[in-house]
A protein has these predicted regions:
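C-terminal segments
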Residues: 133-201
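Flexible, glycine/charged-enriched surface loops at secondary-structure junctions
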Residues: 40-46, 73-79, 127-133, 151-155, ...
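Short, solvent-exposed amphipathic alpha-helical segments in soluble enzyme
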Residues: 2-5, 64-69, 120-124, 144-147, ...
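ALDH superfamily catalytic-core signature
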Residues: 1-98
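Short, well-ordered beta-strand elements within core beta-sheets of diverse protein domains
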Residues: 50-51, 101-110, 125-130
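Conserved glycine-rich beta-strand-loop-beta hairpin in the small C-terminal domain of fold type I
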Residues: 96-103, 122-126, 148-149
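Residues at or immediately preceding the N-termini of alpha-helices
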Residues: 25, 111-112, 135
Length: 201
């Protein structure tokens, strides 16, 4: 607020995942675990999971058991905690706050539209994910969620070094404009165009 020069704000944590009805339990499990293994910090860690109301209770129990074995702390909204007392009750202010620890909170939603609205209200808006078998759902999510990066059926895990080894990433920006998304050394520079002619047009 008191900066006298342009500021490029980076974001960390509080990334959301929407688990669509009838989509892969194993993919959800793998994406959550992998996202928390970012180096050196959990920049894109999935900390909040929105679950379609029609999800099978047995699938939830399998997921939670697996995450518990990996050392995760699990929380849920009031509806989930009432049905599954092993979950800790989430506080309202936590929906918009990053944990930056191995903590994941779960919430039931009625539809994809509800999930998109919730994510746009509470997410850090730099990396959000969806697991779905529907191309239409994936497109609706990608176009509807106001985040710098959208991950469809793939882990949002952050790595300082790109897979091609050409770029070093310093973080993720959720600011709107051309400096949104991955922050690299190139992001911190600008360009200058020099046009030379011989007087002919």
């Amino acid at each position: 607020r008191q900066a006298t020069c342009p500021v490029l704000k980076s974001a960390m944590g509080n990334c959301y995942l929407y688990w669509s009805v009838n989509s892969s339990l194993e993919m959800v499990r793998s994406m959550i675990i992998d996202s928390h293994e970012s180096e050196p910090d959990p920049v894109n860690a999935i900390e909040k999971v929105l679950i379609h109301r029609q999800a099978l209770p047995s699938s939830l129990l399998v997921l939670w058991s697996s995450l518990k074995e990996k050392g995760f702390e699990l929380k849920g909204d009031a509806e989930l905690v009432a049905a599954f007392p092993q979950l800790q009750l989430v506080k309202d202010e936590e929906w918009g706050t990053p944990y930056l620890t191995k903590t994941v909170t779960f919430k039931l939603v009625d539809s994809l539209e509800s999930a998109i609205a919730w994510i746009n209200q509470y997410s850090s808006s730099h990396a959000d994910s969806i697991v779905t078998e529907s191309y239409q759902e994936s497109r609706q999510f990608a176009l509807g969620v106001n985040s710098a990066s959208i991950y469809i059926n793939t882990s949002p895990r952050f790595s300082r070094h790109s897979s091609r080894g050409e770029t070093v990433f310093l973080g993720m920006s959720n600011q709107k404009g051309r400096r949104r998304g991955f922050i690299s050394l190139e992001t911190l520079t600008t360009v200058k165009h020099i046009i030379q002619g011989n007087g002919r047009f």
